[in-house]
Amino acid sequence: SRSTIGASSKFTDFSIPKITRKNVSGLSYRLMPSDRWNVSAFAKYYRQYNKGPVSQNTDGIGNYINLSNTASALGYGAADTYFIWKDLQVKLSYEKAFRLPTTDELFGDEDLEAGKMNLKPEKSDNVNLSFSYNHQFGKHELYAEAGLIYRDTKDYIKRGLDVLGGTSYGYYENHGHVRTKGYNLSLLYSFSRWFDIGGTFNSIDTRDYEKFLAGSSLQESMHYKVRMPNLPYRYANINANFYWNDLFVKGNVLSIGYDSYWQHDFPLYWENLGDKDSKNMVPEQFSHNLSLSYTMKNGRYNVSFECRNFTDAQLFDNFSLQKAGRAFYGKFRVFFGK
């Protein structure tokens, strides 16, 4: 369905080279006042150079010229961990972070994704607090973790949908202010070298905090404090693995694995618009995968087989586009190192 005219499509110009270079440099300092207390501080320097087609039209499509830009930023943060007692640890961290745009966000996919070469990096203030518990009793081990997340983001890179000439396409833009709050829970149990089972649950609430419409200081946005569209906000996974050590030959391992992913249904567009009963939704989905692998010579050789989505459930991406159904994979790996 690509619409091509000469060396151009609706969403890009193939004759203009597309270049991006990312560099991230970091420096950290760690202090251990005691065996139970650990403090670290760090700084990161981000730099990105982009060169490629930029549209001169107001809708960002067509009439491309070749332009370049460079973005740089300094991020920093600190983290603190403390053992309340032997098996219980608390972690607290803060980071002034930046997320550089990806290749698809900058240049699209040259088909049905329109990139935006002059996207700004996302900048955010991130705070994380978590408690973790790890206890061993005989051949058994239990690990549990609970965490809180807070993220205040400016220039949030948002993907949207539009229609041009009867063709739907995706596009990217910087959205002024977004705030994220949430929590995650994890639990893992393992028995010796034979078995483990675990799972995670996440609840992430991302909302629009841009109070006024772009270009206006008076008109309040109807999406203010409304959950951002196209983002799942409750999801979970479970995985279990069985290991048969020294099968046939000492050092060889047979492993059988199962994992699943659940995701609730969520609105395709802004949830405060449209009739509740007829609203476009990304459906709830629940997928299951199975894997079998045999490792030989202490990891030098590995043969694996996998069946993904073995129940052939209908799965969708964040824009309600259906993913592939049941699929089978095989892989053989050889490690040539010592």
Regions found by a protein language model. Give the residues of each.
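Residue-level signature of outer-membrane beta-barrel architecture
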Residues: 19, 29-37, 72, 80-83, ...
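Extracellular loop and loop/strand-boundary signature of outer-membrane beta-barrel proteins
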Residues: 7-17, 28, 58-67, 111-119, ...
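Gram-negative outer-membrane beta-barrel transporters
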Residues: 144, 149-152, 173-267
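Signature of Gram-negative outer-membrane beta-barrel scaffolds
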Residues: 1-85, 100, 213
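Membrane-embedded beta-barrel scaffold of Gram-negative outer-membrane proteins
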Residues: 83-95, 121-181, 202, 208
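Outer-membrane beta-barrel translocator domains and adjoining extracellular loop/strand segments
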Residues: 2-12, 51-60, 102-110, 156-164, ...
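Transmembrane beta-strands of outer-membrane beta-barrel pores
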Residues: 2, 45-51, 94-100, 107-109, ...
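Conserved C-terminal beta-signal and adjacent last beta-strands/turns
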Residues: 30, 77, 81, 92, ...
